[in-house]
Amino acid sequence: MKDFVAIDFETANNCRTSACSVGAVRVRNGEIEDSFYSLIRPYPNYYKFTYIHGLSCEDTDPADHFDKVWPPLKEFIGDLPLVAHNSPFDSSVLRDTLEHYGFSCDTPFFCTLKAARNCSALKGLENYQLHTVAAYFGYDLANHHHALADAEACAIIALHIL
């Protein structure tokens, strides 16, 4: 796959509508072309996962709700397919958050986690977590669980196995 957008969401809590940040990396002709990052004021606005990504209400209270983040993100994505590591999670966050704000999106999603599990070159890996697979392909994911860093890692993986 040479043209796609790798995307990653971080959520504030267990609710799929609680996206608190999004990172996206656009790839065209097999090269990273551009990136998009935004904090999001989540709904509902309470934090359970600060220990994972470090974000809290202090970070996202000044941010826009997703209904304001979606138009520039949608423009950034354009007509490209989406790629995520564990796409069932990210696609459900996108779908549920869009539905909450009255939007929809039928962009196809591809999963680098599923592809990694099926890739014969990766059979000896300890696990197929994002940082493990990214490291195999030479990407140092120093800021794991920062949405843009995770999207960049996903893009690198996708360029190798999709």
Model-assigned labels for residue ranges:
Residues 1-107, 127-145:
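Conserved non-catalytic scaffold segment of RNase H-like nuclease domains
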Residues 146-159:
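Acidic, divalent-metal-coordinating active-site segment for phosphoryl/phosphodiester hydrolysis
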Residues 69, 117, 153-154:
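Short Asp/Glu-rich motifs
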Residues 77, 101, 111-112, 122, ...:
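Short alpha-helix boundary/capping motifs
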Residues 97-100, 118, 136, 157-161:
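Active-site catalytic microenvironments for nucleophilic, acid-base chemistry
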Residues 110-128:
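Short alpha-helix plus adjacent loop in nuclease-associated cores
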